[in-house]
Amino acid sequence: MSDMIHFDSSWDIRVTDTSLRDGSHHKRHQFTVEEVRAIVGALDGAGVPVIEVTHGDGLGGSSFNYGFSKTPEQELIKAAVETATNAKIAFLMLPGLGIKDDIVIAQDNGASICRIATHCTEADVSIQHFGLARERGLETVGFLMMAHSIPPEKLAKQARIMADAGCQCVYVVDSAGALVLEQVSDRVEALVQELGNDAQVGFHGHENLGLGVANSIAAVRAGAKQIDGSTRRFGAGAGNAPVEAFVGVCDKIGVKTGIDFFAIADAAEDVVRPAMPQECLLDRQALMMGYAGVYSSFLKHAERQAERYGVSSAELLVRAGKRKLVGGQEDQLIDIALELQREAAAS
């Protein structure tokens, strides 16, 4: 079991690029090996220290419910590892969707950072997976998703469960892009106070209210040591905090990331953008997700059901927020669409 965390002494914070995982939602999980090699090469060349690669919903996510991968994710992980010179390759897994054998295979393919995600009230389901990952010498990161939905003190208690299980960095994950500045600071500060030297604290933001970079800076100032982003905002919903903009802001305020601003800007424009089906937009649907607190990966599912049943995707997302749906409940969008359809017919 190793206690080492990949963290250079020249960095103030560590940035993880999630374009090849969170971006999979935006691309409907259609990445090719060639695209992964090109993006990893560009990000690695710019100095990005950690690159996450899996199906958008993590290991084992390729399914009827979440969407099938064009290329098996383990092939993509292997290609990423073979391409990277300095960057470490991470993978995401959700207990109950991915299984422990998936962790073993990902490590055998060269990935070295295991990121385990649960709903923010269900950290206990990750205990066995953190144990396995640490036994195998993997660096561990925990994701407390939909962090806007519970107060800071309760989130901190869930973080303690992950840290005690072997998690080396617990993330405040704003899955819906619903948190606003002080709400990020309050949650990060609560985790920092609870965990002390037992684990680092991280932040993962989305752009659904246009605050991805600002919220990430708020997290850094509150004590976060690891920050997620996606180059060119390549992620679910309106996308993640754009790494190139975040790095530029960090340069201007004196926060060291180890990433070359000009190289990451070139990577965003010349390599990542061509792999995107379209830009990640802060449009009406994405805005509704941030406003109503809806899981960002619901966007494409909502658009599909809205078209199928002839209803408003924005109203569909607002009602999903009122029902407090979480990741894994995408199928309930069909029920809501039928409900809206019936209401329209009766009016």
UniProtKB/Swiss-Prot annotation:
Pfam families: DmpG_comm, HMGL-like
CDD domains the UniProt entry points to: DRE_TIM_HOA (cd07943)
Keyword set includes Electron transport: no
Domain Pyruvate carboxyltransferase stretches: 13-265
GO BP: any one term: L-leucine biosynthetic process
SUPFAM superfamilies in alphabetical order: Aldolase (SSF51569), post-HMGL domain-like (SSF89000)
One Gene Ontology molecular-function label: 2-isopropylmalate synthase activity
Enzyme Commission number: 4.1.3.39
Keywords: Aromatic hydrocarbons catabolism, Lyase, Manganese, Metal-binding
Binding sites annotated in the UniProt record for substrate: R21, D22, S175, H204, Y295
Disulfide-linked positions: none
Active site positions, chain numbering: H25 (proton acceptor)
InterPro entries: 2-IPM_HCS-like (IPR050073), 4OH_2_O-val_aldolase (IPR017629), Aldolase_TIM (IPR013785), DmpG_comm (IPR012425), DRE_TIM_HOA (IPR035685), PYR_CT (IPR000891)
Reactions listed under catalytic activity: (S)-4-hydroxy-2-oxopentanoate = acetaldehyde + pyruvate
Site entry: Transition state stabilizer: R21
Amino acids binding Mn(2+): D22, H204, H206
PANTHER family in the cross-refs: 2-ISOPROPYLMALATE SYNTHASE 1, CHLOROPLASTIC-RELATED, HOMOCITRATE SYNTHASE-RELATED
Entry's family note: Belongs to the 4-hydroxy-2-oxovalerate aldolase family.
Name of protein: 4-hydroxy-2-oxovalerate aldolase 1
